[in-house]
């Protein structure tokens, strides 16, 4: 029964959840109803806040298949609970549909993949006789009951389980009206519905927050106790806070709604049966619809795969990359000579053929009168944009030690409040107080201990940091991440466009003739090369297009095309329509590049002497793919009968697709020489196609059929200069003990060279290349280790002295750990093999891995996860194009983009410079330290006021209404919001701020200040009780309050109620505690090394000085009107001097102790803990400690690590030295 009751959905995915079934129980509902009435509605609030309690209190367990309510719990570390109600989708009254078949198909997960004719074949799999489909909705996704797996499953589109061949064979003709209605019923409306909630709904949701409920409780309590002014002040603060919060939340909803509204309802044309064209609203699109992309472009309302034509698309909304991308039709496997017809379609794998929702189609091109068509594969929230919007609407909780410790500390305050609560009750009973007064005073102590302003105070530093970041061009869509960025100790950088200049300069070319490399050439515009195949490849093999008359495309393509000085011409819409066929993009050399024509000696022969027009038409394009690391085109030279195929890409990849006899024997050596110097090398290849290959066939031929048996033509050498600020920024990060890692799609040796040039790898450091090979022909996976400095000498020397690779920490403290003097480098393929077959080597490689080359987008994400698994706080800085996954996964992802905000990254820098990284870390550290300072101050504020009230309760007195008001508003709020204004320190330092409140130094700081404050308050309180009052005539106020002079005569039951407030003890405690708030604020307002000194925070300094002067003035020179408002008793002048002495000594001791804790506290704790050899908490630090004494690490050159074939689960391995 337990297996039936608890199942798992989205297994293996990020949003994996456990699911439990429940049915409503009437008697439980009745009990809850009674409980709500008895608790005055508090039980209802509790059940609203805790969904698991709500379900368990009102329901009984049931089988998931038959339940009415499901209880969901995430399986990650947060264990968040959700509940959802089961809904039924009625199908009995739907025309043109077989209701029973429909239920069975959905129940078995075949809603899309079956054609209309064979739907009823699924009857035999169904176990349900119901004419209704059961489903629930969670985070905007529908989950239907699936009989095949006996579980709920989300409804898939054509993005899973559909082959490329099936897309052409079964889905390219479009849907019938009946099938469209069938799918519309199941998938619902195609929209990313971001409804902007009404102000009333937002208000109710905000007010029901536990924090505001607690404030409401406090206000009611204070009103009953006649603390009207303070209650009114809290109400005003709460109203302002709620209005501000409502404005911010509603603004975010409106922005998100506007972002998706551009394509929410547009008219689109779709293909129907018998080649009919129907115009429908985009909200009616379903997976399987064949959509026609208009000539003048559109904003895509869904995810669709191109099956006809070509599109130029702007994907900046998704990736942050503003360069237009060319999308071509999905290769038709029916003509695939390699028999790859069963390849499964995937939007990620085939993204160069997929139009994603929300992206803008700028231009389209079609062939021989055929329309540009795309099959809808995903709709609504299942689309790529829908998933991004879901991640914004339903963000994953942020796991940060500071917040966990904050909740723990609040719990401690609740315990302290409980002690005060019990003490107040006992003390009041002993003094025979009325029941009503006992209840009010006891509850009041709770509202004092847990400060209402704590959440607002904690977020102040983050808000100010966000403003400062915006001033330097860094925009943030996840403010809570700013604090986390203060903990970053490793940053991954993309190379091209991030560490190096975005544009590449053409250094030169090196052609191949007769399988030999010619000398390098720097002039590609020479007359001799104009009509060469090499230049023809440079002129045609690109994805450039003209947008509004301006050549646009990939920066590398632009540089290459500009270097040869050719002209690109595209057909206009009118020309295309006139010829009723595709007009290819044509490239031709400018007139000055062509050879001079021969002068005719005879006027009659002049016609024959004119130079022939030389131009090339680009017939078909296979765009660049990060996974394939190449692109190719099919082109035809004017006048030629046969077409040509041109290819460019990574040299290793291009060479592998060429005839071996055309690749020079010294290819690897020449390539290595260039890459070691940091050049970006691109290889070119060419092939004459068969004459039988017609224009029409080319449009449907597969990529693999073209990209093989090519002739190697040579290399293009591009110079990728470092950005001017790169070395300085990396040096700053290294000084701050922040590791830097390069993650790039470029060549390995080029990446290593750039890493050396920018200072990521020092000149004396060793670089070890890990070349991992997957299992093959019965052999296990293995890793070959090479040293880059000794690659050419490997055969001569089989080993290197281990002392040549010193393995020592750069600092004595593990907290200042820096990667030691060797670095690992590997490519994407090796990284994947290591992840799969060498799991126990992964942490070691993460500790010293510095260069990761030829990395695909998903591999970048896996690398970030692997680094996080060894407890690094990882930052990721990239250009946003191929780094979206890694940017989202990292603790702090920074996209270098001109866009003000990007949904792909928590942070976006408007200026494309990595100088934003230290700026972000500095601001993160400042915000983190501000949070610590504010939290410590608010803790002391609570304890000081709690102890003040407890002392006064012992003599049945209390602080006055306006005294509370003055402390909480004039002192606390002013101090909190000004002490958070300290800007970040001007440079990064090696020391890192603590990650949580539960650390020795912080706890000792708070506890010591509590002891000091409590001690001096007690001193003043008990001293004044013993103080003998002088003759009434000595009172400088010349008042006759003899009844209130001596606390021993205060409360005999006949005095006025005002005497409970206006007494020596109250006045003494009020003045001492008021100064204590200011003293701990100054003591806790830390400056260097993370924030500017507090004396540069002018608002804070001025506020503290004004408050100090004002309190000192009314203490030493009483003002009757102020004394009356604050209910202060005018005490003798001598006692004021005594109070001044207490206050001054208190300030001196507090500040001295805090400074001592700052300077020597950490050292003392480290010394104390070193006696018991404390194990480092972070995994990478513990691992570094182990590796210091491992004689087998790092692996020596020319050795091989083989995976054990027997045990594959734990990835265990053995090192075998090859002689």
Curated annotation (Swiss-Prot):
> What membrane topology is annotated for this entry?
Multi-pass membrane protein
Keywords, sorted A to Z: ATP-binding, Endosome, Magnesium, Membrane, Metal-binding, Nucleotide-binding, Phosphoprotein, Translocase, Transmembrane, Transmembrane helix
Q: Membrane side Lumenal: which residues? A: 223-228, 427-444, 958, 1017-1066, 1120-1136
Q: What is this protein called?
A: Polyamine-transporting ATPase 13A3
Annotated EC:
7.6.2.16
- Residues the record lists as Phosphoserine modifications: 813
Q: Which domain of life is it from?
A: Eukaryota
Q: Where in the cell is it found?
A: Recycling endosome membrane; Early endosome membrane; Late endosome membrane
- Indicate which residues the UniProt annotation says bind Mg(2+): 494, 496, 879, 883
- Indicate the family of this protein: Belongs to the cation transport ATPase (P-type) (TC 3.A.3) family. Type V subfamily.
- The transmembrane residues are 202-222, 229-249, 406-426, 445-465, 937-957, 959-979, 996-1016, 1067-1087, 1099-1119, 1137-1157
Gene giving rise to this polypeptide: Atp13a3
Query: Can you state which reaction this protein catalyses?
Result: putrescine(out) + ATP + H2O = putrescine(in) + ADP + phosphate + H(+)
Q: Does the keyword DNA-binding apply?
A: no
Q: What is its main location?
A: membrane
The top EC class, named as a word, is: translocase
One GO MF annotation is: ATPase-coupled monoatomic cation transmembrane transporter activity
Name the residues that bind ATP: 494-496, 624, 680, 746, 879-883
How would you summarize where this protein is expressed among tissues?
Expression is greatest in liver, followed by kidney, colon, stomach, brain and small intestine. Isoform 1 is highly expressed in the kidney while isoform 2 is highly expressed in the brain.
Q: Cellular component GO terms, alphabetically?
A: early endosome membrane; late endosome membrane; recycling endosome membrane
Q: Intramembrane segments at which residues?
A: 29-49
Q: State the InterPro entries in the record.
A: ATPase_P-typ_cation-transptr_N, ATPase_P-typ_cyto_dom_N, ATPase_P-typ_P_site, ATPase_P-typ_TM_dom_sf, ATPase_P-typ_transduc_dom_A_sf, HAD-like_sf, HAD_sf, P-type_TPase_V
Cytoplasm found in the keyword field? no
Enzyme active site? 494
Cytoplasmic domain ranges by topology: 1-28, 50-201, 250-405, 466-936, 980-995, 1088-1098, 1158-1219
